[in-house]
């Protein structure tokens, strides 16, 4: 039976209801420690640096590491004696022993990428576990008591697998995760309690070392309410360093290919580039000099050259901003304050760009490096019902849409398969429960296989599969058997899928715990790496590719009925391209372009 043979019917959605449940995390065998009722902390598990904080006596305080610093570099190394080094010591070895040191591994959480440190191999979550264990030990040494529970922050745009990988890392480190808190939400919580703004709508601009998130929040009567979130998990301060690397190598024409290849992994060059990036924030130019085979190779990079080369990154930063504002149905002028979070927001280039986009100076009352950890500590105190914390209610939203794979009728007896049908759309407040109705797509079906998906693409194959649920149905003519599919999602990431049809006594239920537990690791990674492939024939022509990509972008940007209409028109245009009828394709191009123009307002930012 074709797994796609369910068709969405345009019945009105059922009223939303709340859904709440808890998830007991599975036990891990690494770094064994027994959990106990002890101090709760907040952890900002960052790409470049990590921090710990605790809420005590009515305020948040940062917890120093073993060297007395609040910022712990997110770097892990194996020393010459075979022992694990974490933090500042490990960061020093990026230059002296790069073959035994790993950094920026947060970017690869939930993937199958491995890091070779000496003769040992680690996954990103294993390296994160080593980092978390070090942070846990620092907290225990400072507080003088066991620490077994923590609120850990993650990028708002982390998907289910990345979130589960973070939980796994915590379990390996001997930490029970009280909650995974979205980073911009944590920053908003810290800002709300510190500033106590009255009826304020603010935007959190969170640019860290490796990830970028933006969230729109409202603060009123002690409530911090997230209206919309968007982001890019592969965009951060590290990418601006890479831009400088390209500028440097472009000037150093005397370098051989072998020398360039060696420099690509040079920690000495990375440190020189990082220094130059900061210097360009204060001066008009910076010199970058490194030792290559016993000789000094140098180049001078001007601020204008750097800013010009960084324009593509600024464009990428702009896209999540537009999506968050669009989903919140707000114009930039309706934002009362912009809060900067993350060390990369210290770059003057970023602050100037924000000032130009919003026509105002961003708020820096909360330390960009500390806000997320402080917010996590507040959340830990709220969970522990600490009486010293001000009464505050926090609501968050879905970062991604959840739905199933279906087919759709294109008319004239044609049907398109592999279509994503959202049930819970992104940026809906959680906990949430919604229901949609689907019917059979062919005669005498005996079962419907529901592929549960997370993502925004109109093509089901381009979204992340969380699992499958097979529903037995009586054989009947096409469309006579329907099923009501209810998705219920809670704040802990627990998804309950319930299928019902009282007329035919159909019922099925399955709970998906954070990620696709029914899939192998190989299948999970394959689903993450799938990309849309344009077919040959007219599809490879520039105009057609442009229109299809524009349609996909607009589908991802819109919600509800508009999203369904756009998705349907994409399917029709693709079907016309496959016909290879050039006259029909030319007419369709004009009509499709005009159709898309109605949904591409272009007024935002």
Pin down the residues of each PLM region.
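Short N-terminal leader segment in a subset of presequences, especially plant chloroplast
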Residues: 9-11, 46
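Oxyanion-binding/catalytic loops of NTP- or PPi-dependent enzymes
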Residues: 26-111, 115-121, 130, 137-605
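Cationic, low-complexity basic patches in intrinsically disordered or flexible, solvent-exposed regions
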Residues: 8, 15, 35
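Aromatic (phenylalanine/tyrosine) cluster motif
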Residues: 4, 11, 19, 24-26, ...
């Amino acid at each position: 039976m074709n797994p796609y043979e369910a068709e969405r019917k345009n019945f009105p959605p059922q009223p939303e209801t709340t859904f709440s449940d808890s998830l007991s995390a599975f036990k891990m065998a690494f770094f064994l420690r027994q959990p106990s009722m002890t101090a709760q902390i907040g952890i900002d598990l960052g790409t470049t640096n990590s921090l710990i904080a605790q809420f005590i006596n009515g305020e948040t305080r940062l917890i120093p590491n073993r060297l007395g610093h609040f910022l712990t570099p997110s770097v892990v190394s194996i020393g010459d004696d075979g022992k694990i080094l974490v933090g500042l010591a490990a960061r020093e070895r990026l230059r002296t022993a790069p073959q035994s040191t790993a950094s920026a591994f947060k970017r690869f959480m939930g993937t199958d990428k491995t890091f070779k440190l000496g003769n040992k191999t680690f996954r990103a979550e294993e390296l994160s576990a080593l980092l978390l264990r070090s942070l846990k030990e620092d907290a225990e040494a400072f507080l003088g008591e066991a620490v077994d529970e923590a609120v850990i922050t993650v990028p708002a745009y982390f998907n289910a697998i990345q979130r589960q990988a973070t939980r796994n890392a915590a379990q390996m480190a001997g930490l029970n995760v009280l909650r995974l808190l979205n980073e911009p939400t944590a920053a908003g919580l810290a800002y709300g309690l510190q500033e106590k703004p009255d009826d304020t709508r603010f935007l959190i601009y969170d640019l860290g070392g490796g990830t970028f998130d933006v969230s729109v929040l409202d603060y009123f009567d002690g409530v911090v309410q997230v209206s919309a979130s968007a982001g890019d998990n592969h965009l951060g301060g590290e990418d601006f360093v890479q831009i400088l690397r390209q500028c440097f190598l472009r000037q150093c024409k005397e370098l051989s290919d072998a020398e360039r290849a060696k420099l690509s992994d040079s920690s000495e060059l990375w440190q020189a580039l990082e220094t130059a990036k900061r210097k360009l924030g204060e001066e008009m130019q910076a010199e970058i000099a490194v030792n290559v085979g016993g000789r000094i190779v140098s180049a001078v990079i001007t601020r204008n050259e750097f800013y010009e080369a960084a324009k593509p990154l600024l464009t990428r930063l702009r896209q999540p901003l537009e999506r968050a504002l669009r989903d919140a149905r707000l114009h930039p002028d309706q934002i009362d304050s912009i809060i900067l979070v993350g060390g990369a927001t210290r770059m003057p280039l970023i602050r100037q760009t924000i000032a130009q986009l919003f026509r105002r100076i961003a708020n820096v009352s909360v330390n960009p490096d500390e806000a997320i950890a402080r917010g996590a500590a507040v959340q830990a105190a709220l969970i522990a019902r600490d009486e010293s914390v001000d009464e505050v209610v926090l609501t968050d939203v879905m970062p991604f849409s959840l739905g199933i794979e279906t087919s759709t009728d294109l008319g004239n007896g044609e049907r398109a398969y592999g279509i994503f049908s959202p049930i819970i759309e992104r940026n809906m407040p959680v906990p949430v429960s919604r229901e949609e109705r689907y019917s059979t797509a062919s005669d005498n079906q005996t079962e419907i296989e529901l592929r549960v998906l997370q993502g925004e693409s109109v093509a089901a194959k381009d979204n992340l599969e969380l699992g499958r649920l097979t529903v037995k149905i009586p054989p009947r003519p096409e469309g006579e058997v329907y099923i009501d599919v209810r998705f219920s999602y809670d704040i802990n990431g627990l998804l309950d899928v319930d299928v019902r049809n009282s007329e035919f006594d159909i019922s099925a239920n399955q709970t998906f715990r954070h990620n696709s537990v029914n899939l192998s690791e190989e299948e999970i990674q394959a689903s993450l790496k799938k990309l849309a492939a344009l077919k040959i024939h007219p599809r490879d022509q520039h105009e057609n590719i442009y229109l299809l990509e524009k349609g996909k972008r607009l589908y991802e940007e819109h919600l509800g009925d508009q999203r369904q209409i756009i998705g349907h028109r994409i399917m029709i245009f693709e079907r016309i391209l496959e016909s290879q009828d050039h006259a029909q394709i030319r007419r369709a191009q004009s009509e499709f372009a005009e159709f898309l123009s109605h949904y591409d307002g272009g007024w935002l930012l």
